[in-house]
Amino acid sequence: MRKILVTNALPYANGDLHLGHMLGYIQSDIWVRFQKLQGNQCIFVCGSDTHGTPIMLKAKSLGITPEELVTKYSNRHLQDFTDFEINFDNYHSTHNSLNKEIVEDIYNKLNNKNLISKKAIAQAYDPEAKMFLPDRFVKGTCPKCKAEDQYGDSCEVCGATYDPTELINPRSVISGQSPIQKNSEHFFFDLPALEKNIKDWIESNTLLQPEVANKLAEWFEQGLQSWDISRDAPYFGFAIPGTNEQKFFYVWLDAPMGYIASFKDYCNKNNINFGDFWGDSSSESELYHFIGKDIIYFHTLFWPAILSSTGYKTPTSVFANGFLTVNGKKMSKSRGTFIQARTYLDNLEPSYLRYYFASRLTSRIDDIDLNLEEFVTKSNSDIVGKVVNIASRCAGFIYKKFDATLSGEIFDPELESEFSKNHDAITQAFEKREFAHAVRLIMALADKANQFIDYHKPWQLAKEEGQEQKVHQVCSQGINMFKVLIVYLKPIIPSIVAEAERFLNIQFISWADAPKFLINHKIDKFKPLATRIEKEKVDKILEDTKKMLENEQAPQSKKEEPKLDIAAECTFDDFMKVDLRIAKITEASHVEGADKLLKLILDLGGVTKQVFAGIKSAYKPEDLIGKHTIMVANLAPRKMKFGMSEGMVLAAGDGKGIYILEPHEGAQPGMRVK
């Protein structure tokens, strides 16, 4: 049994997931499910990437805290993953005390090895927004290939990396103004000092994709540069120790460490030895990172350099996938093809997209095109027309005529052997992430199964006298070929296969036992496992996406400013006549005969006052004892039938509720409110 740890790139928690995201997660989920079916101990972890200026600014624009924003999107992401049948063993967050501990520990180890240095650098600064600009908040023309509208850290056209100050005609994404340069002291990781470590890792990595190896060679030829791992306040993230929260770790330093934190969290929950998988001596374990091609730089240069110098196992390999296009073009909101994961799920089952992606995915870093017409055709033809159709054509005869029991003999051993002989080739295709090849092999077998049924025509044989045994054997072989196919498809379309397993009355079949036919086995009544996709469903996805864009672009109706019924104006001198004091409620009790009043004894720092307050509808007396409030201490005493009231406690209300005012922690009884 192999010990395998798989991570997937952490989704950034400032927006919803779209189908381009799902391409990478579906790819890794298929591979993990395949490994588990083989009996390997394969652990799959992920989590939310939650730090950085984009999150800070978006939260501010929405009037919420960054923590509230990332919690909202983390929950939505996890629901999308669950509904797309992405089965993580653990889902964590980078904004977590465990990750903070790991980040600081790794930073200290790097610092102790003299791999961290400080120097003043010129930073892009937005004078209008009054803040330093992160790389991705500066856009301009690439200094290498001259492509326009590129981010401040890397070019999406030529792949070059650079500093924001190198951009031609830079502009602030926040204000649109040209940023100025302003000096700031930053922390740097000495990447060039670890060049040999990185090259040793590359040479030992037999699974590295050729495209990645070529890109690495190009970066080495350009020369490695020290990496700026810090950002200036204000910033949402972890403060660098000893900087008085003026400098923070760059999100790309703490984000990959979220892999470690998520796995360590899993280990803590499941009593697993972390070192067996990710210790520097865990040679028997395998570690794989699945990522998008846009973050190869961070995962194949910085990450192995950091891991190799801090006592962690370096990745066995890093697998990158390409981008998603729709109908041959870049995803577009205006065309309705920038499809969110939830929009798809609101209209179609996840199995269809999982299958379509699998039918296109290879081990190469190719962009995948979601051709919507082909998507409908392939789903209907392959899943419904080929695979599910085998069972639907044979199940009724077995269930009705033969007591739902499969034959004790194999009708066509040669065909059975052909299904068995393909097992190794399909296994190798899944192992190498050549899912498109695996799907072609599986569908070729499905074609043979349907040809077998077409040739023998059990529906005609059933009408002929004396052909009962042949009908039984032909349909039993059909059901068994279906059984082999669904096991092969289990990593790809797990929910459909789960329904098929219930129909076949089987609990679990290992990958190794996939080709074995069921003999004298009782099945259940067949129910439809998948329905055809109607074109209208796909059209609705596009329509819903366009409507979403229209709602985003629609001008927000100006809200009427709330009107307050303000009392008559008073002068400052008038206000200063009111002596407001902090008071501690030492006693509280009901007032006999009064429907609205509570009797309060207030301590003003050695001076005691009695007050009758109309707050009975909102508070129980026992809940008030020990609380601090604010009272008008110099109000003329008022004689009431219940006793003397020597002041008034302050409370707010809107006619629906009453809320007594409580001072901030630290205010003491007797202090004057000014």
From Swiss-Prot:
It catalyses: tRNA(Met) + L-methionine + ATP = L-methionyl-tRNA(Met) + AMP + diphosphate. Homodimer. It holds the Pfam family tRNA_bind. Belongs to the class-I aminoacyl-tRNA synthetase family. MetG type 1 subfamily. Is required not only for elongation of protein synthesis but also for the initiation of all mRNA translation through initiator tRNA(fMet) aminoacylation. A motif ('HIGH' region) lies at residues 11-21. The keyword 4Fe-4S does not apply. One of its GO terms (molecular function) is tRNA binding. Gene3D superfamilies: HUPs, Isoleucyl-tRNA Synthetase, Domain 1, Methionyl-tRNA synthetase, Zn-domain, Nucleic acid-binding proteins. Zn(2+) binds at residues 142, 145, 155, 158. Keywords: Aminoacyl-tRNA synthetase, ATP-binding, Cytoplasm, Ligase, Metal-binding, Nucleotide-binding, Protein biosynthesis, RNA-binding, tRNA-binding, Zinc. Its cofactor is Zn(2+). The lineage of its organism: Bacteria, Pseudomonadati, Pseudomonadota, Gammaproteobacteria, Thiotrichales. This is Methionine--tRNA ligase. ATP binds at residue 333. It is found in: Cytoplasm. InterPro entries: aa-tRNA-synth_I_CS (IPR001412), Anticodon_Met (IPR041872), Met-tRNA-synth_bsu_C (IPR004495), Met-tRNA_ligase_1 (IPR023458), Met-tRNA_synth (IPR014758), Methionyl/Leucyl_tRNA_Synth (IPR015413), MetRS_core (IPR033911), MetRS_Zn (IPR029038). One of its GO terms (biological process) is methionyl-tRNA aminoacylation. A motif ('KMSKS' region) lies at residues 330-334. Its EC number is 6.1.1.10. GO terms for cellular component: cytosol. Binds 1 zinc ion per subunit. It is an enzyme of class 6 (ligase). Residues 574-674 form the tRNA-binding domain. Its main location: cytoplasm.
